[in-house]
């Protein structure tokens, strides 16, 4: 049976994260059966409520443990049960404006003027994330910290990701 299934709570606007995502269940039954045929699969949520079999694809869900029961219909005493953990991983907590973005005005008509841009990570240590900075959509080489000093006009953006590659 499959290990824990992780999915990032990656709403277009991170302010809309709600802990519910669409899990791809298209390969669940093939993975569970591992080539066996003629078996019956039953699914139960954390409260023991029977779920549809096969599971809907996608399965829209919050983090939960789904119990899977595989049974031989010819010999009902021959069965196996496993727990399939579904985990929704929140995105990094970044301070954003009401439009779901972070913006800062940089005046570049002053020679030698620079400004420090901050990735806006809040709620956790900035060192627990990885950063990729971009200027006009092109990755800036070797800029991997939570702040960047800039003096060139353009649109700066940053991808902030956690250890699960959610960004």
Question: Where do the protein language model's features map onto the residues?
Answer:
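Proline- and Ser/Thr-rich low-complexity, intrinsically disordered segments
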Residues: 1-167
């Amino acid at each position: 049976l499959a290990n824990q299934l992780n999915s990032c709570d990656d709403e277009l606007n991170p302010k809309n994260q709600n802990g519910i995502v669409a899990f791809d269940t298209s390969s669940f039954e093939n993975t569970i059966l591992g080539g066996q045929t003629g078996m019956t699969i039953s699914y139960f949520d954390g409260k023991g409520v029977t779920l549809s079999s096969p599971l809907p694809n996608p399965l829209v869900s919050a983090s939960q443990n789904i119990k899977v029961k595989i049974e031989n219909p010819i010999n009902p005493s021959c069965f196996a049960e496993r727990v399939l953990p579904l985990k929704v991983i929140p995105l990094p907590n970044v301070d954003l404006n009401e439009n779901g973005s972070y913006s800062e005005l940089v005046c570049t008509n002053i020679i030698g003027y620079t400004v420090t841009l901050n990735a806006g990570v809040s709620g956790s240590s900035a060192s627990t994330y990885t950063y990729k900075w971009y200027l006009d959509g092109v990755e800036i080489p070797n800029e991997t910290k939570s702040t960047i000093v800039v003096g060139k006009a353009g649109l700066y953006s940053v991808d902030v990701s956690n250890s699960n590659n959610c960004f």
